[in-house]
A protein has these predicted regions:
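Membrane-helix interfacial "entry" motifs
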Residues: 14-19, 58-70, 95, 99, ...
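Hydrophobic alpha-helical transmembrane segments in multi-pass integral membrane proteins
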Residues: 82-92, 139-154
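Structural signature of hydrophobic alpha-helical transmembrane segments
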Residues: 35-50, 96-108
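Short, highly charged, low-complexity non-transmembrane loops/tails of multi-pass membrane proteins
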Residues: 7-8, 182-198
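Hydrophobic, lipid-facing residues on alpha-helical transmembrane segments of integral membrane proteins
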Residues: 20, 24-36, 68-87, 105-117, ...
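Short, Lys/Arg-rich, polar N-terminal cytosolic tail immediately upstream
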Residues: 1-17, 193-195
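Pore- and pathway-forming membrane helices of multi-pass small-molecule/ion transporters and channels
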Residues: 27, 43-62, 108-114, 119-150
Length: 198
């Protein structure tokens, strides 16, 4: 004998709809931050650093909670980079010959320690993208010279590189959040799935 069975009503996963299209929000965000990299001379921020961390924001979830991963991991990576370049600068003061040897030593020691400590900090594991980007952005800012150069003190220049790498990274997280926020997402009420009869 056939029995009527009504399928259980299932609710759709809650979704949101953008008020401002995402593509337009991206363009608005770019226009918003361009002055920071164009109009301040040697004090202009390296916006390419910000763009990379902006991408990290979306890669790691595109929500406010990413601040708990990106900021500490990126900061730690940049910190290790500063330590490596400071060590390189110090070694270069008394190691004669090719200047590449102090760099080899500093990077070998620094990267070894940087990777080793990852096992003790979960945020460095879940945020490994930001962790290593912190290092790479610090090295890029330093070697490209994308920082103020109002002094010739080699150690101060390393610290300035660190400050600008961090500023660019923090700006990147902010514009990721800003980009999503200005779409003004609206929640869409979940709808029950259509019932079926067998």
């Amino acid at each position: 004998m056939a029995l009527d069975q009504t399928a259980e009503i299932q609710m759709e996963t809650a979704k949101t709809k953008e008020t401002i299209p995402f593509w337009l929000a991206v363009s608005i965000t770019v226009m918003f931050i361009l002055p920071l990299g164009l109009y301040f001379g040697q004090y202009s921020l390296p916006l390419w650093v910000a763009f990379i961390v902006w991408a990290e924001y979306f890669a790691l979830g595109a929500n406010l909670g990413t601040i708990k991963t990106i900021i500490p991991a990126y900061t730690a990576g940049a910190f290790w980079g500063v330590c490596m370049i400071l060590l390189y600068t110090w070694l270069a003061t008394f190691m004669t010959g090719a200047s590449v040897y102090p760099m080899y030593i500093a990077l070998f020691v620094g990267v070894s320690v940087m990777v080793y400590v990852m096992k003790y900090f979960k945020v460095f594991q879940t945020g490994s993208l930001a962790y290593f980007n912190g290092l790479s952005m610090l090295l890029a800012v330093y070697f490209v010279g994308a920082h103020p150069t109002f002094t010739t003190n080699a150690y101060v220049l390393v610290l300035l590189s660190g400050a600008y790498a961090l500023a660019g990274g923090y700006l990147g997280w902010f514009i990721g959040w800003f980009n999503v926020t200005i779409t003004f997402p609206r929640p869409i009420a979940p709808k029950p799935a259509a019932s079926t009869r067998v």
